[in-house]
Swiss-Prot record:
It comes from Arabidopsis thaliana. The chain crosses the membrane at residues 51-72, 76-98, 142-162, 163-183. The keyword Cytoplasm does not apply. It is a multi-pass membrane protein. The gene is PRA1A2. GO terms for biological process: vesicle-mediated transport. May be involved in both secretory and endocytic intracellular trafficking in the endosomal/prevacuolar compartments. One of its GO terms (cellular component) is endoplasmic reticulum. It is found in: Endosome membrane. Keywords: Endosome, Membrane, Transmembrane, Transmembrane helix, Transport. InterPro entries: Prenylated_rab_accept_PRA1. Belongs to the PRA1 family. This is PRA1 family protein A2. The lineage of its organism: Eukaryota, Viridiplantae, Streptophyta, Embryophyta, Tracheophyta.
């Protein structure tokens, strides 16, 4: 895949739609080979490739740094967990998987309530849903939960006076991620994984026709 021709918006869209259930890459692979890029275009290509390939490792890194920064502030730590959950809801596969598991659990106690949590019926025109991009969680659009969790986390951060620590932790983790993604040399496994994800995306679009 030619990452030079991939825009930042395309990377964000791919991260939103890709499966996040895959385990993180091993430490041996994560810290394997490092080298500085030879040009600005090479740096941009490597940065986008590594952000996509090591996405799970970077997400765990952010959670770990936030946990260290807020270990003495339990309320702010809960706020950070809510923020991580709201960010995870932005991913299609996570939101759909969470919705199914939560409704399945509720069904054991109240089938009637679980039925109400099902997403509304989407009209289909020529084999395609008119709202294919709309993802529902417990019968509500996922942005409702994203905004609710983000608001609750901000309230907890202000209440615990941990907002400054959160900013420090986020900036630190962001700096570490950018440095690692910039100097980590993409290996053959990363390129093969990219081709596999491309094939899955094409096959998914074909199956929806």
């Amino acid at each position: 895949m030619d990452w030079d021709n991939v825009a930042a918006e395309d990377v964000i869209e791919a991260l939103r739609e890709v499966e996040w259930s895959t385990p993180p890459r091993s430490f041996g692979e994560f810290f394997s080979r490092f080298a500085f890029p030879r040009s600005f275009s090479k740096w941009k290509s490597r940065l986008k490739c590594n952000l996509y390939y090591y996405r799970t490792n970077y997400f765990i890194l952010v959670i770990f740094v936030l946990g260290l920064a807020l270990v003495t502030r339990p309320l702010a730590l809960v706020g950070a967990a809510l923020t991580a959950l709201s960010i995870a809801f932005l991913n299609d596969s996570f939101a759909a998987s969470f919705n199914e598991k939560f409704i399945r659990t509720i069904r054991h106690f109240s089938p009637h309530m679980a039925a109400k949590m099902r997403p509304p019926h989407m009209p289909v025109i020529r084999g395609r849903s008119t709202a294919r991009k709309t993802v529902y969680v417990c019968g509500k659009p996922r942005w409702v939960f994203v905004i609710t969790f983000l608001t609750a986390s901000l309230v907890m951060w202000f209440s615990s006076c941990g907002l400054l620590w959160v900013l420090y932790a986020l900036l630190t983790s962001l700096a570490v991620i950018i440095v690692h993604a910039s100097i980590r040399t993409p290996n053959l496994k990363a390129r093969l994984n990219t081709f596999r994800e491309e094939f899955r995306a094409v096959w998914r679009n074909y199956s929806e026709l």
